[in-house]
Amino acid sequence: MVRIIRADTTTARSQCFALRRAVFIQEQGIDEAEEWDADDATCTHYLAHDDSGPLATARLIAKGDMAKIGRVAVAKQARGTGLGRQIMTHVLAQARGGGFATAMLEAQVSVIGFYEALGFVAEGPEYDDGSGILHRVMRRPLA
């Protein structure tokens, strides 16, 4: 059974970071300097796991009345199982419960359809965020 937790412990955060390292740095070739930032120390991290270990992660950054969601990563063996949707639904519910009016994210162009299915709408042009991967800003209301 998959459980999604707020990653408040050192162990849970380490598992979030290990998933991000596997997905973004090892699989996608993103430079470590691009992956880790100051927001990691102050944001809320979420971790989906089961008895086999960590499976997915995401983080939420408070920006006024907007919740910025990012670093959504699903372990290779868990892709296509609905777990990405499950962790996003959880994070969106947490943001709504926290009083945020809007959710925003910067989606890799290859997964825009995934976020559209969750109610996000793409805005503006595609851009390279410095990682060499094209992104678009996406938003959705939380009310």
Describe the role of every protein-language-model region.
Residues A62-G70, R79-G80, G130-H135:
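A conserved beta-turn-beta hairpin within the catalytic core of GNAT-like acetyltransferases
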Residues M104-E106, V121-R139:
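Conserved catalytic-core motifs of GNAT/GCN5-like acyltransferases
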Residues R20, Y115, F120:
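Conserved active-site tyrosine of GNAT-family acetyltransferases
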Residues V74, G80-A93:
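Conserved acetyl-CoA-binding loop-helix of GNAT-fold acetyltransferases
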Residues M88, A95-Q108:
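Conserved GNAT acetyl-CoA-binding A-motif
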Residues M1-H45, H49-L55, P141:
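Short amphipathic alpha-helix that is part of the acyltransferase structural core
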Residues L47, G53-I61, M66-A73:
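Conserved beta-strand in the GNAT
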